[in-house]
Amino acid sequence: MAAEIHSRPQSSRPVLLSKVEGHQDVVSAALLIPKEDGVITASEDRTIRVWLKRDSGQYWPSIYHTMSSPCSAMAYHHDSRRIFVGQDNGAIMEFHISEDFNKMNFVKTYPAHQNRVSAITFCLTSEWVISTGHDKCISWMCTRSGSMLGRHYFTSWASCLQYDYETQHAFVGDYSGQITLLKLEQNTYSVITTLKGHEGSITSLWWDPVQRLLFSGASDHSIIMWDIGGRKGRTLLLQGHHDKVQAICYIQLTRQLVSCSADGGIAVWNMDISREEAPQWLESDSCQKCEQPFFWNIKQMWDTKTLGLRQHHCRKCGQAVCGKCSTKRSSYPIMGFEFQVRVCDSCFESIKDEDRTSLATFHEGKHNISHMSMDFSRGLMVTCGSDRIVKIWDMTPVVGCSLATGFSSR
């Protein structure tokens, strides 16, 4: 069912502790059970499984429950041992897990959506289960009565969700590339603002209530940090992945962001430094360096008897430049560019060697990651992917945590 990986920890990369195998289809979500050597998984094969580590070092399912529809999302509240499972048919089912994690009792079904559930969160204080779905809406339902409290529709599929429990604000990412901030009330709501910055669909969100930072990952391979608490519209761009960003997790203790992409890439970003905002791209009818006209500037082309050029942009200064004035490429990590991007020749000369020092570390998960979650107290991460395999990692070598891991890599 599951293998224990016998490898010696390396100081510079995540340590693979265990593989959990046995699902017959894509694993949609996997969550580590706090203070236990256990993992809860939800899969497209219509099963919910609770895996506990045995004396042999292998993981075996102590709970194996078959649902009526493929499982698409999951939320687990450890203190109350309540689990909420979103399904492809739009329903959310609540279960209660026994103290020994060997039994799971059905509680109730919530008719939350008309289509696939994409994300779920549970708020104990208000007794709300909040969810998003491919029916283009966010809904919040009362877990006491099972009744619908509110619903808001977007223009495209709602793909991911984060919730601020203290202020009752919800952040919803959608397939159009927008993030909507809503204030949820008992029977009403208000749309606060919409955040736009990605060029692809939003695939993952993470909200840090301490620093009031929102992180978003998207299919455009990039991550944006939105400084909500600063109230100045400050954003930071992080580009280091070569495929769509599938999951992100911010470690408040060490000020590090962990991100995973569909190609198996795992990145750890240092956010405990003063990063620079990437500039807005400037628009011009001619190169802002040599003043040669761009190809749509017919008048200047006619007046100067020259051919029009293609417009490019310097990633460091944002100026509109032609190809001849931007022949160089450079990384510029302080602005979030971890690999080489186009810069104008004058900006290239201003970048020193020390400016190219990476501010992130990159690692290989060796499977197509579709979901990731972490247990901060133990420095553990669990990833799952389209290969039906769940992997448990010790992240302490790369996230700077000195906390002892509960998963042995003997």
Feature map (PLM): residue ranges:
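Conserved strand-to-loop turn within each blade of WD40 beta-propeller repeats
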Residues: 42-45, 86-89, 132-135, 166, ...
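An edge-strand/N-cap motif at the start of beta-rich repeat modules
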Residues: 1-2, 9-22, 32, 39, ...
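Cys/His-enriched microdomains
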Residues: 285, 312, 320, 342
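Per-blade loop-tip surfaces of WD-repeat and WD-like beta-propellers in eukaryotic adaptors/scaffolds
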Residues: 2-16, 50-71, 78-82, 88-114, ...
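Canonical WD40 repeat/beta-propeller blade segments in eukaryotic WD-repeat proteins
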Residues: 24-32, 68-76, 115-122, 156-163, ...
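C-terminal interaction modules of eukaryotic adaptor/scaffold proteins
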Residues: 248, 260, 382-410
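Cys/His-coordinated zinc-finger cores
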Residues: 313-334
